[in-house]
Structures are given as structure tokens and as C-alpha cells.
Amino acid sequence: MKLATLVLVLALPAAAQAPSTLAPTGTLRGVFLGSNPVQGRVDTATGDATGPVPDLVRELARRIGVASNVIPAPDAAGVIAALNNGTADIGFLAYDETRAREVDFGAPFAVMLNSYLVKAGSPIRASADVDRAGVTVAAVRGQTQELFVSRTLKNAKVRVFQTMPPQAEVERLLTSGDVDVFAINRQRSLEAEAASGAKLRALADSFLEVDQSFVVAKGARAKLDAIAAVMKELNAAGFMQRSIDRAKLTGVRAPGVK
């Protein structure tokens, strides 16, 4: 490469160099947890994805001048698989050390709170009341909350579900006493409380505050560097907090926002 050409390439802004790094196919393919409202929601009728992650993927694609494709995955394992088999370029997950063995994590795009859900008449009033003998805590396998409670609770029993039960089953499990607590994110806890007709109650405090972050396939750190350059501009402009507010999410905030 001639010296003049090399100087020109090095002088290009990161966003100008990002297309080949982030979207080698010409389309930025972002995979996210389609069942997690903190990241986004998928309209079952149209298939359209809305929310913070879809907004972010589309804005990143616009800024680097490529098309975008937002891909919902059923769970964290699906996000990781899509990255490592090359069907997605970037993904989004809450940080956990076990996941970091399979994918590389970048900077957070949001901070998520997690709150236990109990039946309305439960004597459990705060997160500190949960880890006691005789208490059964439900969680969904592989989700951030399950990884946390399985690792940290010493006295309570953890009951792991393969998938998130529907609202009616969550109500039955809690009100019947089959389980005493459901460990989910705050947005889901509040939605379940609201839908229950006063049968359920989300605890007021958070048992875990966790970063929602960009993830890429192992060894693809160059993608995270390219994303960081664009995200610096987006964060300065308040892009993520506006997206979170537009989605009417509770217990979620952009990094640096109190």
C-alpha cells in the first residue's frame, strides 16, 4: 500500500471504516432476545421488531451506510449460536461470566434492574427476605436471573423452568404455593403484576443490576472497537435513553443516566 493511501485510510473516521468490519455481507445483522421486552418486542402479526435493540441496530446500520436485519432469538443460547455460526454480526445479552466464555462482550448499551415477583399476600417484602429455608424461587434456564440465583442463593430452593411460563401459569404457580418467588427482570415483574388483577406483587427493590451489552463471536474484537466509536456519538446525543423512554420501559436506563 502506498504511503499516501495508508495515511488516507488511517485518517478516515471509524464510522467510514466500519461497514466492512461490522457488516461484511452488506447488511448489519443484529440478533437479540425476542422474548425480552428490555431489548425489544416482536409483533406476532407483522413480525416487526421494536424497542431499544431494534432501534440501535437500525441506527448503527444507517450511520455506516448499510441495510439492517433485526433477528429475534428464543433465548441466550440462540443469540450465542447465531454469532458463532456466522448468521449474525452483532448480538445483545446481559453480561454473565459463563456467557463470556463463549462470546466477547463490549460496552453496555443499557442497565437492567431485576425484581422478584411474589403473590400479593406473600410475607416476602424485600429481596433480602428471599434466601431462606422453605422458599422456592422459580427462574428460566439460561436467563440472567437463573444464572444469578443458582449461583448465589444458599438456603432457598431454585426451581428451573425451560421456558418462561405464560401469565396464567405464573399466577397459578405463585398463588397455589408451588413456588414462592419468580426471578425475572423488573419490566416483566411489573407487567405480570399489572396483568394479574392484584394477585401478584413485584418487590420494590432490585436483587440484581446488570449491564445489557453488545456481544460478538469470540475473537471478533475489531467489531466491538467499531461499535464503540459510533456508540460514543449516540450516547452523547442521548439516543439510547430516548429509545428506552419511547418503549415505556421501567427498571431500564442508558449507561450514565441515573
What are these regions (language model features)?
Residues 7-16:
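Hydrophobic h-region of N-terminal signal peptides that target proteins for export
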Residues 18-94, 163, 226-227, 237, ...:
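Extracytoplasmic small-molecule ligand-binding "clamshell" domains
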Residues 34, 111-121, 186, 194-232, ...:
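Periplasmic-binding protein-like
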Residues 48-64, 122, 128-136, 143, ...:
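Extended ligand-binding regions for polar small-molecule ligands
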